[in-house]
């Protein structure tokens, strides 16, 4: 599990209270405690080896983690059609996206939901100051930035949603010696999706997204095109979602280290499951996530495989 995800977990100091205390309150939310296992062989991941001795495919490193997730909502009106919130979105978690948000939501009478959010941890994490350094220990440095999101869900009760975001990132100690690979950047993201039901219990979501990653170095800039399909099944005592996606990343210029222009094919598969009929444990559920990502690049250095498995308990109020 990368340090971006861990930083998301660290920013969730949500306390658990009894369900009765929240029955007539404007507060609502959920909190989960998760433990799990992650594995990756990405040369760019700071959870991997500090020292690499070649610029080929990376070696596998494993990690065990214990971490919280959650969200807290406060209704601004008695009708509860306006809310401020912080935490991780259940909809995002269902498709394998972990992002801490501070935001505002408004429910229109026509079924549309407006969501405006600031995401402080999507960009902020640790990266290698020079990931291409060989034969000696690589040092980490902080990546800082800001991300802003605008989402319109279920437009006019049509099942269509539109998601847009803008983000910036700065590297504290950028030590890559090639101007073409400088990583400070601006990113623009847009995603459209459609949700439909197959029957009263099951449905699917199709989504397409585009990202323009405008970095200081042309060889670090890219355009990304992603297609995603999610299947979900809902019963009174459990919920299941399965998401698969394909993403094409096309970089803008030749990489000066490898003398070719990078191109990545990224495959993701994510399964989420929740069971909430625990005897004598009202408002509690068992949750589990399993996900894998394969990055197939035309440059061996960027090829990687990662695996994430997690199980935990969730409390909803």
Where are these regions (language model features)?
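Short loop/turn motifs that connect adjacent beta-strands in outer-membrane beta-barrel proteins
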Residues: 20-27, 77-85, 107-115, 152-161, ...
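Transmembrane beta-strands of outer-membrane beta-barrel pores
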Residues: 35-39, 76, 88-92, 118-124, ...
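Outer-membrane pore/translocation modules
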Residues: 99-207
């Amino acid at each position: 599990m990368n340090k971006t995800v861990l930083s998301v977990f660290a920013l969730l100091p949500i306390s658990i209270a009894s369900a009765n205390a929240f029955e007539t309150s404007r507060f609502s939310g959920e909190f989960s405690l998760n433990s799990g296992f992650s594995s990756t062989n990405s040369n760019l991941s700071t959870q991997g080896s500090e020292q690499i001795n070649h610029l080929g495919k990376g070696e596998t490193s494993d990690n065990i983690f214990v971490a919280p997730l959650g969200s807290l909502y406060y209704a601004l009106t008695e009708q509860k059609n306006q809310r401020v919130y912080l935490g991780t979105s259940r909809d995002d978690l269902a498709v394998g996206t972990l992002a801490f948000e501070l935001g505002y939501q408004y429910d229109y009478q026509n079924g549309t939901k407006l969501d405006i959010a600031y995401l402080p941890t999507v960009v902020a994490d640790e990266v290698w100051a020079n990931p291409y350094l060989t034969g000696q220990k690589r040092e980490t440095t902080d990546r800082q930035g800001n991300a802003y999101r605008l989402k319109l869900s279920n437009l006019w009760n049509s099942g269509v949603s539109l998601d847009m975001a803008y983000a910036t990132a700065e590297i504290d100690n950028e030590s890559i010696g090639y101007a073409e690979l400088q990583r400070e950047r601006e990113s623009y993201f847009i995603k459209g999706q459609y949700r439909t039901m197959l029957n009263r219990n099951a449905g699917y979501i199709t989504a397409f997204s585009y990202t323009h990653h405008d970095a200081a170095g042309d060889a670090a800039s890219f355009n990304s095109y992603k297609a995603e399909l999610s299947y979900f099944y809902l019963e009174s005592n459990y919920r299941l979602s399965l998401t698969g996606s394909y993403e094409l990343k096309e970089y803008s210029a030749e990489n000066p280290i490898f003398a070719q222009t990078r191109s990545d094919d990224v495959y993701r598969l994510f399964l989420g499951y929740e069971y909430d009929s625990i005897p004598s444990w009202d408002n509690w559920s068992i949750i589990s996530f399993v996900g894998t990502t394969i990055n197939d690049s035309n440059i061996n250095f960027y090829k990687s495989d990662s695996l994430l498995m997690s199980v935990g308990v969730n409390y909803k109020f």
